[in-house]
Design a protein with these regions (language model features):
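Low-complexity, Pro/Ser/Thr- and charge-rich linker/hinge segments at domain boundaries
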Residues: 32, 159-163, 279-300, 404-443
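Aromatic (Trp/Tyr) and acidic
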Residues: 173-179, 186, 194-202, 225-240, ...
Length: 879
């Protein structure tokens, strides 16, 4: 191979052979480069060599140890039974045929190279156990072994399909593309080959507009991890970086301007030039952030314009004349700044004609902080209000001198699409069942944890997560460990941990009762379609199936399931050796299940499933009585309400709703604080949490509820909503959050703090609740500082690398419907802080603290209970 043989020749080019044009010019029209980067850094190609060999080419995200191991690979075929997925076929042997440095880092990167792998290209050959058939497809899938993964890039590919060309590899490693930011600023996107030292010299840059040179006045940079080469568990990983470099070239671009950027070999390995023709109707700018799925016709519609330039103007940049000064001196120079509030247009994509013209509203200066302790957006921000555009259609936002947004819909069905994708994500988390590739859009998975659950005496109150279950098993009459006939539920997160989540069922059942007309049988991709039960209820029942199996004859219910430890993130299901154990019975989960079982009973009765309804109600009543008779012992301060009175209040009101027996209503009133203290909050941190009970009470038919008590609880929930609204009311990017909750583990991406507003809106029609639900969904679906949709499959520019075992398949990446945790305020581990530029500081640019790669677990791992809450919110907004 001739390294860099496809780089263009230009004024700054080295004397290398020239072949086809570099694809970087074409990349200017790609909505999201992340999938291409994963292809370049992971499996690039798979080729058949005879009938028993597959040659696999790997990019720079490749572990030298793992890629040579037989146990790290699988070979699968959709049409050759000998290589069926369920057989988990391994190669007989793996041989490394070649490994060479494909791109050499520029000089002056000694410090960066300490954490960066070489930019290598490797070929391994997999020798197969049986011959491949002539007319069948075969895929190589890279897993991992011995605590190393083969790659963090693309993990699977069919032979002869979608191979990466050398010019694409050069573009992804080097200068990927150039785009408009606005007001004379350009964004140059670089891959791992970029040298900060080389980029900090103006002499190494050549920028032209319409063939005329433009000086680079100032430069800023944001750098973070693009892809890992994981070895071991946690710690510091070798990593491949991505760099957003912002150039100030002075004058604002006009339609038709042809922009070209070239750099010397001192700036980057790989591709060194890129160009584009500026047109506000065609050039997507990352400065404009909107909901990528769309907006309801009669709902508020907001988008934003703003862009943080990182270190701009970087003091290390030599040779520039200095950044152009903005007329508005109150604005931060480190982000996009307009002399006056910019105009914008909402454009019908089909006709190309504007349907609205407006002026953006200035809402925030990047010189300010959203709170006393933290800066979140870190940029100047303008808000675009186009709420008066109501005609259904597909639109985009256009701003002179900046560019356009990604397209979005205005339609009454936008949340139905979001709902179905999120429902698919929850289905993909099912445990104890084989997943049908016809339903998952191609992901096949055998049934897991279907052999029953081993009973233990471990109390969950003493071990909130893992416990030494294998040392505390319950033996049956035969003296052997007692295995309960329990299966079902949903996996906790991205691996095969069977940690049970009753709250999935609680969210889905509540969603159905809040808006029953929005749900039907046959609506979602679930195997129970056609059984006469709405699909959202079927999904909830799959969760309850597990808890039914955990109920003893005396009515008590074990406190859930857990494994000995987290499974390996690159293990296939059949290799999971962490076990499936049940906690001891306790009052908390007995009461919680009583409430959920009672709710399922009344829903199933309305669906004409009398026998199933009767069984659930009997189980609910027995669980409730057991919980009352067996309060959890050994509780510490503050735990009594968590384990006894709080869940009992929830169970009591749900049983009252189902049975109409006043004794349960009396129990609820005796337990809840509102009879004696009408000002009591729904929950108080560390003291009590009556959220489940309060929501259940509002679901009561009016003739069953105590009118005064219901109004009191409703007011308490509105007070909680107003508190969550205050969490970002003064922020430029608005979404519901607890003002005391840091941006961590989903706070900046999930809908968890929107659940209260969802109940209130569905039951009262409150317009303010609806507006904040919509704005929270906007944040999830792209209207955030990063311009990312946090859910795979919803939008054109989304997260691509959630930590999820569906990435180990022939498609080479995760399924749709998975929601990432999002920004992590303290940049938890995984080399994030060590590699970030500008250097990480507590409380700065918090909403930018995100890496889109599987191994940044606190940022990228989906969790099923949170996805169920998102489904609930989408459901309330649908139809």
């Amino acid at each position: 191979m001739k390294t860099n043989s496809l780089l263009r020749r230009g004024a700054f080019a080295a004397a290398v052979l020239v072949a086809a044009p570099l694809v970087a010019a074409d990349l200017s029209e790609v909505a999201d480069l992340k999938p291409l980067a994963m292809k370049v850094y992971g499996i690039r190609s798979v080729e058949r060599k005879g009938d028993k060999t597959l040659a696999v080419t790997l990019g720079a995200s490749s572990s030298a140890g793992a890629r040579r191991l037989v146990n790290a690979w699988r070979v699968t075929s959709p049409d050759d039974p000998a290589y069926a997925y369920s057989k988990f076929v391994k190669p007989d042997s793996v041989a490394e045929v070649s490994s060479e440095v494909e791109f050499k880092y520029p000089d002056g990167m000694a410090e960066q190279k300490k954490v960066m792998p070489s930019l290598s290209r490797t070929v391994v050959e997999l020798k197969l156990p049986t011959p491949m058939k002539k007319n069948c497809q075969y895929a190589a899938v890279a897993y991992g072994a011995e605590m190393e993964v083969v790659t963090s890039g693309r993990t699977g590919l069919y032979a002869g399909e979608d191979a990466v060309a050398a010019d694409l590899a050069a573009a992804i490693v080097g200068l990927r593309r150039v785009s408009s930011v606005g007001e004379g600023k350009l964004l140059c996107e670089f891959g791992a080959g970029y040298s900060p030292a080389g980029g900090n010299s103006a002499a190494n840059w050549k920028v032209t507009v319409n063939g005329k040179p433009r000086p680079v006045l100032a430069l800023g940079r944001r750098s973070k991890i693009d892809c890992y080469v994981p070895k071991g568990w946690g710690g510091t990983y070798p990593c491949l970086m991505q760099h957003d470099v912002f150039l100030d070239i002075g004058d604002t671009l006009k339609k038709g301007d042809k922009v070209s950027v070239e750099v010397t070999a001192a700036v980057t390995a790989g591709a060194r030039d890129a160009s584009f023709a500026f047109d506000e109707s065609k050039c997507v700018s990352r400065s404009i952030q909107a909901n990528q799925v769309g907006y309801l016709p009669d709902a508020p519609k907001f988008a934003y314009v703003g862009c943080w330039f990182g270190s701009f103007p970087d003091a290390k940049f030599a040779g520039g004349a200095g950044a152009r000064k903005c007329a508005n001196t109150k604005l931060a120079v480190s982000s996009l700044a307009f002399d006056a509030n910019p105009s914008f247009e909402i454009v019908d994509e089909k006709s190309g004609k504007p349907v609205k013209k407006g002026t953006a509203k200035f809402v925030f200066s990047g010189n300010e902080k959203e709170s006393k302790k933290a800066s979140y957006a870190a940029s100047n921000v303008w808000e675009l209000d186009f709420s008066d555009v109501r005609t259904p259609g597909r639109y985009f936002i256009r701003i002179p001198g900046v560019g356009r947004s990604l397209a979005f819909h205005i339609d009454k069905a936008v949340y139905e699409k979001a709902l179905k994708v999120q429902a698919l994500g929850v289905y993909e988390q099912r445990c104890g069942i084989a997943l049908d590739p016809k339903l998952t859009r191609g992901w096949e998975r055998i049934a897991c944890h279907a052999g029953g659950v081993t009973a233990s005496t471990c109390a969950r109150v003493k071990n909130p997560e893992f416990a030494p279950f294998d040392k505390h098993v319950v033996n049956g009459a035969d003296g052997k460990p007692l295995v309960l006939a329990a299966s079902g539920g949903h996996h906790d997160a991205g691996d095969y941990n069977p940690r049970s989540h009753l709250d999935v069922a609680q969210a889905l059942l509540n969603c159905y009762e809040l808006k029953p007309d929005a749900f039907a049988d046959g609506q979602f991709a679930v195997p129970e379609r056609g059984n006469g039960i709405p699909d959202i209820v079927d999904e909830a029942l799959w969760q309850l199936k597990l808890w039914k199996g955990l109920q003893d004859e005396d009515g008590g219910i074990r406190a859930g399931t857990e494994s000995l430890r987290d499974p390996g993130f690159f293990q296939t299901v059949e290799l999971d050796d962490t076990g499936d154990y049940a906690w001891a019975k306790d009052s908390k989960m007995s009461f919680q299940c009583a409430g959920a079982f009672a709710q399922a009973a009344r829903i199933l009765k309305k669906c004409g499933k009398a026998a199933e309804a009767k069984d659930f109600l009997s189980r609910a009543q027995r669980a409730y009585e057991w919980g009352k008779a067996n309060p959890t012992p050994g509780l510490k301060d503050g735990q009594d309400k968590e384990y006894n009175s709080d869940p009992r209040a929830y169970a009591a009101v749900s049983l009252y709703h189902t049975t109409r027996d006043a004794k349960y209503h009396d129990d609820f009133k005796a337990i809840s604080p509102w009879a004696s203290n009408p000002k009591a909050e729904v929950s108080s941190w560390g003291k009590y949490d009556l959220s489940l009970a309060a929501r259940q009470y509002l679901l009561l038919p009016k003739e069953l509820a105590d009118a005064t008590l219901r109004k009191t609880i409703e007011e308490a929930m509105f007070a909680e909503f107003r508190m969550f609204k205050s969490g970002s009311a003064k922020w430029p990017y608005k979404f519901l959050r607890n003002p005391w909750a840091p941006i961590t583990w989903g706070t900046g991406a999930y809908e968890n703090y929107a659940v209260t507003a969802a109940h209130l809106y569905a039951l009262t029609g409150d317009k303010e609740c609806r507006e904040w639900l919509v704005r929270t969904c906007d944040n999830t679906l792209g209207a955030n500082p990063l311009g990312l949709s946090w859910i795979t499959g919803l939008g054109e520019r989304t997260i691509r690398c959630p930590l999820h075992n569906s990435r180990y398949r022939a498609a080479g990446g995760p399924v749709i419907g998975l929601q990432a945790q999002g920004p992590m305020q303290r940049g938890h581990g995984y080399s994030f802080k060590e590699t970030l530029y500008p250097a990480w500081k507590e409380g700065e640019a918090v909403l930018h603290a995100f890496i889109d790669n599987h191994w940044a677990i606190a940022m990228d791992e989906p969790t099923v209970n949170n996805m169920a809450n998102t489904l609930l919110v989408f459901g309330v907004l649908s139809k």
